[in-house]
Regions:
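A short glycine-rich, hydrophobically flanked beta-strand micro-motif that places a catalytic Asp/Glu
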Residues: 177, 181, 336-340, 413-415
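DNA-contacting surface of Y-family translesion DNA polymerases
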Residues: 7, 228, 238-410, 421-425
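Short aromatic/hydrophobic contact patches that present stacked aromatics
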Residues: 144, 380, 414
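C-terminal helical/tail subdomains of lipid-metabolizing enzymes
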Residues: 417-419
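Gly/Gly-Pro- and Ser/Thr-rich, intrinsically disordered tail segments characteristic of DNA damage-repair
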Residues: 1-275, 282-285, 426
């Protein structure tokens, strides 16, 4: 029986949540999600579609946004009589209607816990239509759903059911989505990532594209660049192009007459690449559900520009904790322990008053210089969880009680969560 899968991606999710919270339209409001209290080198976690239309990348650094908006406004100003703007706006239709307005945008500080809550709320909407065993959460803003068993139940086509689900999400949350429908997981993902991006959205901003193995070959065998395809990174693309393969059609052709050369290039991974070149995907959602995660920990580390005091370091660790919990939720994992390591360098004791007060152990670094001994500690959570609140409340405070964490300004911070496993929070 031919299966019907859909891949749903929430449009500029973090940015859309921030717009909805402000009562603004996510499709027409110029907004970036970034922590402007840090340096302008900070990466924007999301950019709204209207701001992207001005040539701003979805993962730009904040200074790049500032620079690009400056260029746009310089060009707009030249067209204004007298060279003076009459006002400014972050509403894109208003900007397009009135060239005398300066392009403005909102910088929204990331709220990871809020995004997780909204993602959970949207997942609950999916559960109104399908069962959990037919859903794979790929990330906080993207899911795969096997619609096969539900089409007869609802008396709808895969496109009609997808449209119904997406419109329910839109009406309930104000957030729109892009979707791809395919006869396997790979085709649904490619339909969403490549085909849907090149079609006009409907009145609600929704794009839905469909692919079969045959239409995939007809439409995308000549598509470039190769990096647009799922699981083809720059390294793969560079290696393929170095051997005369510039499209998926080229890969499929090479597999027909010289399959061994692909295995020599990519080893066992060549099998998946060949399958994808032909539009095949043997993996199902049931297979994904049966898979056991191999890693038992997740981690995050930062080298700070200068040694941070305890209070400043707490802010950094809080952000790192939010990012790790977000990764837990994205991967449908749980944890039962958090671990903190704080490292130091010679700058940590550079101020005389701090050096005079420090009573802890001193060790030598790789260069033989004296530095404070690194601080290390862990905090069991008592149960497996992916709750940001529980991890913050139960672990965040206690972990700072480790010896040395508060003693002197730290330069290196490593945070990890261990006991990670696939499972349902207790």
């Amino acid at each position: 029986m031919e299966r019907s899968y859909v891949s749903i991606d929430l449009k500029s999710f973090f940015a859309s949540v921030e717009c909805v919270e402000r009562g603004l339209n996510p499709l027409t409001t110029n907004l970036v999600v970034a922590d402007s209290s840090r340096t302008e080198k900070t990466i924007c976690l999301a950019v709204t579609p209207s701001l992207k239309s001005y040539g701003i990348s979805g993962r730009a650094r904040l200074f790049e946004v500032v620079q690009r908006v400056g260029e746009i406004n310089a060009a707009r100003r030249r067209k204004v009589p007298g060279g003076t703007f009459t006002g400014k706006s972050y509403n894109d239709p208003e900007l397009k209607k009135n060239s005398a307005l300066e392009l403005d945008y909102i910088v929204a500080k990331p709220q990871m816990s809020h995004y997780i809550e909204m993602s959970t709320r949207i997942y609950d909407i999916y559960m109104k239509y399908v069962a959990p065993e037919d859903v794979h959460v790929y990330s906080i803003d993207e899911v795969f759903i096997d619609l096969t068993a539900y089409l007869k139940t609802y008396g709808l086509t895969a496109r009609e059911l997808t449209q119904r689900i997406i419109l329910d999400v839109l009406r309930s949350t104000g957030i729109t989505a892009t979707a791809g429908i395919g006869t396997n997981l790979y085709l649904s993902k490619i339909a969403m990532d490549i085909v849907a991006k090149h079609i006009e959205p409907d009145a609600d901003g929704v794009r839905i594209a469909e692919l079969t193995e045959q239409s995939y070959r007809e439409q995308l065998w000549e598509h470039r660049p190769l990096t647009d395809f799922w699981r083809v990174g720059r390294g793969y693309a560079k290696k393929l192009e170095a051997h005369g393969m510039y499209t998926m059609g080229d890969v499929a052709l090479r597999a027909e007459y010289d399959e061994d050369s692909l295995y020599k290039l990519f080893g066992v991974n060549a099998g998946l690449l060949i399958d994808h070149a032909w539009g095949y995907e043997p993996c199902t959602i049931a297979d994904i559900k049966a898979y056991r995660h191999g890693s038992s920990s997740l981690g995050s580390g930062q080298v700070l520009q200068c040694p941070y005091t305890f209070d400043k370091a707490r802010i950094i660790v809080r952000e790192m904790t939010e990012q790790l919990v977000l990764e837990l939720v994205e991967k449908r994992l749980v944890t039962d322990q958090i671990i903190l390591d704080v490292g130091y360098d010679i700058e940590s004791l550079s101020r005389r008053e701090i050096a005079a007060q420090y009573k802890g152990e001193v060790v030598r670094d790789h260069y033989g210089r004296q530095v404070p001994k690194p601080a290390h500690g862990s905090c069991p959570l008592g149960r497996q969880t992916d709750s940001l609140k529980l991890i913050m409340d139960a672990g965040f405070g206690r972990i700072w009680e480790i010896d040395g964490a508060k003693a002197v300004p730290g330069k290196y911070i490593d945070l990890s969560i261990s006991g990670v496993d696939v499972g349902i929070p207790e």
